[in-house]
Regions:
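C-terminal segment of N-terminal export signals and the immediately downstream linker at the start
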Residues: 5-6, 22-61
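N-terminal secretory signal peptides and thylakoid transit peptides that target proteins
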Residues: 1-22
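Mature-region segments of soluble proteins
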Residues: 49, 53, 71-173
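Hydrophobic/aromatic-lined pockets within catalytic cores
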Residues: 16, 20-23, 59, 63, ...
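Residues marking the start of alpha-helices
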Residues: 2, 39, 101-104
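Alpha-helical structural elements of signaling/regulatory helical domains
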Residues: 60, 64, 82-85
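Short acidic alpha-helical/loop segments enriched in Asp/Glu that coordinate divalent cations
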Residues: 64-72
C-alpha cells in the first residue's frame, strides 16, 4: 500500500494532540504509529486503548489513523465522567473481551478479535460502542476528506445552489 506524505493539516492536528496531552499530564496513551495522545479522565488507559482498537475493528478504514478513532473514545470518556453506569458498562465490557481468550483482547489476531466481538454483538456494551463510533467518527469534519465529502452545505445555501452535481467520481450520464 502506498503511503501518502502528511499534509500540513495532518501535522498540525497530530502535534496539537501531543501538546494537549503533555499539558494535561495524567495518564496518557501515546500511539506508536503517529504523534497523537489520548488522556482519558474517567476510563483507565487500558480500557481507553481497547475501545480505540474496538472502534477500528468495527469500522475499519486503512486510510484513517488511530487518532480519528481516539476521538470516539474521548467523547465516550467525557460521558463516562458524569455517568457511573456507562463507565461500569465500558470497563466490564472490556474485561469480558480480555477474559474471552485469557489474554488482552487487543493482542489477539483480527480473526480472533472478530470472533470475540461476535459473542458481544447482541449486548448493550457492543451497541454502545458501535453507536458512539458511528456518531463520533462519521460526524468528524477531519474525517470527511478521507471519504471525499465536502461537508455540510446548509451554510452555503444547500446542495442545489452550490452545484450538487459537480462531483467527479460519478460517471457522466
Amino acid at each position: 500500500m502506498k503511503e501518502h506524505a502528511p499534509s500540513r493539516r495532518d501535522f498540525l492536528c497530530s502535534t496539537s494532540f501531543v501538546a494537549v496531552g503533555l499539558a494535561t499530564g495524567g495518564s496518557m496513551i501515546l500511539a506508536p504509529d503517529n504523534a497523537w495522545a489520548l488522556s482519558p479522565t474517567a476510563l483507565d488507559s487500558h480500557t481507553a486503548q481497547t475501545l480505540v482498537v474496538m472502534a477500528r475493528q468495527l469500522f475499519p478504514h486503512d486510510r484513517l489513523g488511530d487518532q480519528y478513532y481516539a476521538t470516539v473514545v474521548e467523547a465516550v470518556d467525557k460521558q463516562a465522567a458524569s455517568d457511573a453506569a456507562l463507565r461500569k458498562l465500558l470497563t466490564d465490557g472490556v474485561a469480558r473481551l480480555d477474559g474471552a481468550r485469557g489474554i488482552a483482547w487487543v493482542q489477539l489476531s483480527n480473526g480472533a478479535r472478530n470472533a470475540v466481538l461476535k459473542t458481544e454483538e447482541a449486548g448493550e456494551f457492543f451497541s454502545t460502542v458501535r453507536t458512539a463510533t458511528i456518531n463520533n467518527l462519521y460526524t468528524n469534519p477531519l474525517v470527511y476528506r478521507f471519504f471525499g465529502f465536502e461537508g455540510s452545505s446548509v451554510e452555503h445555501g444547500g446542495y442545489i445552489d452550490s452545484g450538487f452535481d459537480d462531483i467527479g467520481w460519478l460517471p457522466n450520464a
